[in-house]
Swiss-Prot record:
Annotated function: GTPase that plays an essential role in the late steps of ribosome biogenesis.
Chain positions recorded as GTP 2 binding sites: 206-213, 253-257, 317-320
Gene: der
HAMAP family in the cross-refs: GTPase_Der
Domain EngA-type G span(s) in chain numbering: 9-171, 200-371
Alphabetized SUPFAM superfamilies for the sequence: P-loop containing nucleoside triphosphate hydrolases (SSF52540)
Record: residues binding GTP 1: 15-22, 62-66, 123-126
Alphabetic keyword roster: GTP-binding, Nucleotide-binding, Repeat, Ribosome biogenesis
Any one GO molecular-function label of the UniProt entry: GTP binding
Keyword Coiled coil: no
Protein name: GTPase Der
Subunit structure: Associates with the 50S ribosomal subunit.
Residue intervals of the KH-like domain: 372-456
GO BP annotations, alphabetical order: ribosome biogenesis
Length: 461
């Protein structure tokens, strides 16, 4: 969120010692910042932290417990009342397992008098049966209170919604979100990318006798893989590593795949080994024989890349003896493999080693896209613009809204949309968003996984 033109909204957490103030602070901050224990008065200083609540930047204050008999109680109380006066909203936390004391009510009313923008938060209501205990706090005189359990993560989502509403933050445009704050929303799901060199794992797939072994030999310039016109020569996956610049690439020549009705004995074993090899791969080279028309099995084999969420490059082999003109083959390819429209296409003749260097460099380019991570602020800006250009369809007349987006994984890129009604995200609108992201960020040859979650699921994950 760009805060140059506005002051951050401040939320102060107040209450007596050992009611769960620091635990609530940690829960909202999504980090273990404040020390928590069963010993009253653990927090003495005011912990201050910029945090994000569903994508909105606020400043959160965790104050010391205001116990009458505590050491330095006068100083702590004075500091807390000053924090209350300067805050936009106060969360006054009480222990739902205890009977309200006169001292607690007196302190609350003193705080409320200084700043009436105050929520009564009743903590430690761990289940529905304990809700009855919350009625005892009606003596505080608040028309509405919030029953929560920080330790069980109950009621937190509703509290956050109410806080955002009270601070009028639900009117802020999502594209105004600050990149650093949004990074914290990923909740450490996306580990920091390792700087160690990684070998790109490439699986070569295709039906029997389309030229996979010839392609491996051309790529590695070795006769490592036996080449024969006899179908099914390759049984075990064969791997070979090469170096392009300073990047290592490991190729796996998998067993050719034929119709299931013809898979017997050792070929069934070979298919299982192929599946296991692909589980470890980053990119698939789908080899298609263009000396004859494509067959249904080609399409089925291509689904292996989707099944294992691999980057993919289409290799049209035997181009020197292609069965039809360029335009006709490309039109057929587009029609039969329309779900792979994002995949680059390279024509080659493996036996004559044509366009082999192009394949090598394309592998590196696709891997860079496969490993890509979008800056969170930029991601939200693009999503916001897309939803403004074409608003989300309503869900039975009810508004459907994307609160924010976050990329939580790479290889392949995986993005979550945090929404008020995630189940209402239609597949056609999801496809529109994916196409928008592809156009904006160039995910060449890379599957892009987009899912929708509600705020509660996002917080739990």
């Amino acid at each position: 969120m760009n805060t140059s033109h506005k002051t951050l909204k401040t939320i102060a957490i107040l209450g007596q010692p050992n009611v769960g103030k620091s635990s609530l602070f940690n829960r909202l901050a999504r980090e273990r910042i404040a020390i928590t224990s069963d010993f009253a008065g653990t927090t003495r200083d005011i912990n201050k932290r910029k945090i994000a609540l569903n994508g909105y930047e606020v400043e959160l204050l965790d104050t010391g417990g205001m116990a009458k008999d505590a050491l330095l109680s006068k100083e702590i109380k004075a500091l807390n009342l000053k924090a209350a006066q300067m805050s936009d909203l106060i969360l006054y936390v009480v222990d739902g397992k205890s009977i309200p004391s006169d001292e607690d009510i007196k302190l609350f009313r003193e705080v409320f008098k200084i700043n009436p923008n105050c929520f009564l938060v009743i903590n430690k209501i761990d289940n529905d049966k304990e809700k009855e205990r919350a009625y005892a706090f009606s003596s505080f005189g608040m028309p509405k209170s919030f029953n929560i359990s920080v330790s069980h993560n109950r009621g937190i989502s509703a509290l956050i919604d109410a806080v955002l509403s009270a601070l009028n933050l639900n009117k802020i445009i999502e594209q105004d979100l600050d990149a650093d704050i949004l990074e914290s929303l990923e909740n450490n799901a996306l580990e920091e990318e390792t700087k160690e060199e990684e070998i790109i794992q490439v699986g070569i797939i295709g039906r029997v006798n389309v030229g996979k072994s010839s392609l491996l030999n051309a790529l590695t310039k070795k006769e490592r893989s036996l080449v024969s016109s006899v179908a099914g020569t390759t049984i075990d996956p064969i791997d070979e590593t090469i170096l392009i610049g300073d990047q290592k690439i490991c190729f796996v020549d998998t067993a050719g795949i034929r119709h299931r009705s013809k898979i017997l004995g050792i070929e069934k074993y070979a298919l299982e080994r192929t599946q296991k090899a692909l589980e470890k791969s980053h990119i698939a080279l789908l080899v298609l024989d263009v000396s004859a028309p494509f067959v249904e099995l080609d399409e089925k084999i291509s689904s292996l890349a989707d099944k294992h969420s691999l980057g993919i490059i289409l290799i049209l082999n035997k181009w020197d003896i292609r069965y039809a003109p360029y335009e006709e083959i490309m039109e057929t390819l587009k029609r039969k493999f329309r779900f792979l429209e994002y995949a680059p296409v390279i024509t080659t003749s493996c036996l004559k080693a044509r366009h082999i260097d192009e394949i090598k460099h394309k592998i590196i380019e696709v891997y860079e896209c496969f490993s890509k991570r979008i800056p969170t602020s930029l991601l939200n800006s693009v999503i916001s613009q897309a939803t403004q250009k074409h608003p989300l369809p309503s869900d039975g007349g009810k508004l459907v809204k994307v609160y924010y987006a976050t990329q939580f994984a790479t290889k392949p890129p995986q993005i979550s949309l945090i929404m008020n009604r995630p189940k209402a995200l239609h597949f056609s609108y999801k496809r529109y968003l994916i196409n928008t992201l592809r156009k904006e960020f160039n995910f060449l040859g890379t599957p892009l996984i987009l899912n929708a979650k509600d705020k509660k699921s996002a917080q739990q994950n």
